[in-house]
C-alpha cells in the first residue's frame, strides 16, 4: 500500500520505515496507515466554494489577491507545482477546481501525480482509454488508501476524472519505490547499473540540492534531539552523515518527478500541473531546483495549499511559494 509524505509526517513508504526505526526513531510524527479512522470528506462535499471562500495570498505583500489573480499567474506559467498536505480534503478540492479551470482554458495540458509511479503509466493509460475502471486502477496501483483510508476515491480519483473529461493527460510522475530504496542503500551508482529499460524509470540529481531546502530536511530530522534553536550548517555533508542516504532517497523523488514533467514537454499553452507534497516544492524545494537545472527557460509557478497560515516565515528569502492558498485565516 502506498502512502504519503508531507512537511510534518512520514507515513508508510517502505523506503523509510526500517531506517527510521534503527537510526532516528522520532524523526517525524509517524502516522501509520492503520491509524486513519473516519472516512475522508469527498472533494465535492467539503462544504465551501473554494473559488470564493479561501484566501489566495501573494507572499510578496501578504495580500489576499483572489482566485482570478491566481489564474492569471498560472496563465503565464509552463509548469505549476501544487504543494499539498496529503490528508487535506479542502486542499484537494482546491486542486480539483484549479485543474478544472486550467484545463478548460488550456485543454491540451497535463496533470502529473506524485502518487503514481512511472511503471504504472500503462495502468493510468488503460483507465484513460476505458480499458479498466477506477476501482481497478486504485487496486492495481495500490493507491486505495493514499493519504488516508479511502483517500484515493475521495480526493485523487475525482481529479483524474476531471482531466479525463477534458481530454487532458495524466502522468505517473514518481520513481518506483524499489529504486528509491536502491538509491538509499546502494547509492546513485547502483541506479546507473540498472538495465536501460528499468533505468528509464528513475532519475537522480547531478548534484544534491542545497539552500533552505536542504537545511529544512536536516532541521526536521534533528528536531527530536534538541529545541531546534541551534543553527544547522549543511553547506557540506559528511559522507558518513546518517541522514545522507535518506536525502538521496528524497532527491531521487525530486529528480524523477522533475524529469517526468520535462518529458511531458510543458509550454505556456500545454501546461503541466504536478500534485505533490509541499515539502518537495516549498522554499525553493528540490523539484524546483531540479527543474531550474534541467529546463532553465521554463516558467515555474509554485502554489502552496495550506489549512492555515504556517508558523514558519513564509515571506522570507526564499518565500514558501509564489502563491499561497489558505483555507482559513483564523
Briefly describe each language-model feature range.
Residues 34-77:
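N- or domain-start disorder-to-order transition segments that initiate the globular core
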Residues 27-35:
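Hydrophobic h-region of N-terminal signal peptides that target proteins for export
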Residues 19-26:
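Sec-dependent signal peptide recognition
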Residues 62-63, 67-104:
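Zymogen propeptides
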Residues 110, 122-260:
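A substrate-binding/cap region within the structured catalytic cores of diverse enzymes
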Residues 39-46, 256-267, 273, 278-330:
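C-terminal regions of proteins
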Residues 86-101, 108-112, 118-128:
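Membrane-embedded segments
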Amino acid at each position: 500500500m502506498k502512502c504519503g509524505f508531507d512537511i510534518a509526517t512520514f507515513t508508510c513508504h517502505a523506503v523509510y520505515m526500517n531506517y527510521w526505526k534503527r537510526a532516528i526513531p522520532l524523526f517525524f510524527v509517524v502516522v501509520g496507515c492503520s491509524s486513519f479512522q473516519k472516512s475522508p470528506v469527498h472533494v465535492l462535499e467539503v462544504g465551501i466554494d473554494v473559488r470564493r471562500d479561501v484566501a489566495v495570498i501573494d507572499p510578496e505583500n501578504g495580500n489576499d489577491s483572489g482566485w482570478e489573480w491566481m489564474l492569471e499567474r498560472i496563465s503565464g506559467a509552463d509548469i505549476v507545482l501544487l504543494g499539498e498536505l496529503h490528508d487535506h480534503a479542502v486542499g484537494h478540492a482546491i486542486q480539483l477546481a484549479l485543474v478544472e479551470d486550467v484545463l478548460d482554458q488550456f485543454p491540451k495540458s497535463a496533470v502529473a501525480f506524485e502518487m503514481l509511479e512511472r511503471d504504472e503509466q500503462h495502468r493510468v493509460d488503460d483507465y484513460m482509454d476505458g480499458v479498466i475502471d477506477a476501482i481497478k486502477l486504485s487496486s492495481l496501483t495500490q493507491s486505495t488508501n493514499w493519504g488516508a483510508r479511502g483517500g484515493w476515491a475521495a480526493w485523487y480519483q475525482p481529479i483524474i476524472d476531471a482531466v479525463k473529461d477534458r481530454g487532458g493527460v495524466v502522468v505517473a510522475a514518481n520513481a518506483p519505490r524499489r529504486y528509491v530504496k536502491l538509491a538509499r542503500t546502494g547509492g546513485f551508482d547502483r541506479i546507473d547499473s540498472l538495465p536501460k529499460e528499468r533505468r528509464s524509470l528513475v532519475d537522480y540529481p547531478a548534484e544534491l540540492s542545497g539552500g533552505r531546502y536542504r537545511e529544512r530536511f536536516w532541521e526536521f530530522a534533528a528536531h527530536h534531539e534538541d529545541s531546534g534553536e541551534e543553527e544547522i550548517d549543511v553547506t557540506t555533508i559528511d559522507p558518513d552523515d546518517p541522514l545522507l542516504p535518506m536525502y538521496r532517497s528524497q532527491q531521487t523523488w525530486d529528480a524523477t518527478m522533475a524529469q517526468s514533467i520535462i518529458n511531458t514537454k510543458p509550454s505556456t499553452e500545454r501546461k503541466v500541473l504536478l500534485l505533490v507534497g509541499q515539502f518537495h516544492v516549498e522554499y525553493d524545494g528540490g523539484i524546483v531546483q531540479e527543474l531550474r537545472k534541467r529546463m532553465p527557460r521554463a516558467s515555474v509557478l509554485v502554489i502552496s495549499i495550506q489549512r492555515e497560515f504556517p508558523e514558519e516565515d513564509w515571506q522570507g528569502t526564499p518565500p514558501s511559494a509564489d502563491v499561497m492558498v489558505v483555507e482559513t485565516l483564523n
